[in-house]
């Protein structure tokens, strides 16, 4: 059976919000196949002279949401990110292709089977696909949440640069099976349970001990260096490599 060919489609920007000093969130309406938490999509821009620039962005919205939400970090000299963060306006259209990706997805059945305890570790904008997983889980039944306790470790430079900070705190306050720990590398922590240091193997060990669960699945997303550090630390914590799903982002566009 041949795989479905993904085609470019026009998506209209319906909402824009500058959510942190470096990140802009965009909500787009587009007729795409339903996505699975953890997937991404391609965005393509075409200049009047025909020049095209393309970039992949993780989907932040939960499966079934009426709009596709992207969180775009403004990168120096980034062709696509500069347009989306600084120029794009509500009502504009961009080309989208997706959803894409099958190795970084979280999609348990309604019993929570094949899930178990889930550890999420994100650095910077690497939290975006993890946010789709968190939202997907929050929308599931109590039985699924109970069968898949979750810990999110999220590292950013400062409190102000934590994307989805308030929403994540609210999830934790309303769900005893969801645990959240922030780490900030250049600013003070704002909650006693958090950490104001780089996410190291020792810090990871401390957070896992407080969690008290054995991760059956691990999702980590961030820069190449961040993901390498986390995956190495996880293996040292005796988490089998086959349980770890990693997604890296580059530094262009």
Predicted regions and their residues:
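A short, basic/flexible loop-to-alpha-helix module at the beginning of a structural domain
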Residues: 99-113
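Conserved beta-strand elements of the Class I
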Residues: 117-119, 218-219
């Amino acid at each position: 059976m041949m795989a479905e060919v993904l085609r470019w489609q026009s998506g209209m920007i319906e909402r824009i919000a500058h959510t942190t000093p470096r990140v802009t969130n965009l909500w787009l309406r587009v007729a795409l196949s339903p996505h699975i938490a953890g997937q991404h999509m391609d965005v393509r821009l075409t200049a009047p002279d025909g020049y095209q620039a393309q970039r992949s962005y993780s989907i932040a919205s939960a499966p079934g949401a009426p709009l596709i939400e992207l969180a775009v970090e403004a990168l120096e000299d980034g062709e696509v990110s500069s347009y989306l963060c600084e120029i794009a306006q509500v009502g504009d259209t961009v080309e989208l292709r997706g959803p894409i990706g099958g190795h970084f997805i979280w999609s348990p059945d309604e019993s929570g089977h094949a899930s178990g305890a889930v550890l999420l570790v994100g650095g910077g904008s690497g939290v975006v696909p993890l946010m789709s997983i968190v939202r997907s889980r929050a929308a599931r039944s109590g039985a699924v949440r109970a069968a898949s306790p979750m810990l999110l470790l999220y590292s950013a430079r400062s409190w102000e640069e934590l994307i989805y900070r308030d929403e994540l705190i609210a999830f934790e306050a309303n769900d005893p099976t969801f645990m959240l720990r922030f780490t900030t590398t250049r600013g003070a922590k704002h909650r006693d349970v958090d950490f104001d240091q780089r996410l190291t193997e020792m810090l990871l060990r401390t957070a896992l001990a407080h969690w008290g669960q054995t991760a059956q699945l691990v999702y980590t997303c961030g820069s190449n260096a961040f993901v390498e550090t986390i995956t190495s630390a996880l293996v040292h914590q005796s988490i089998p490599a086959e349980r770890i799903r990693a997604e890296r982002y580059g530094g262009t566009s």
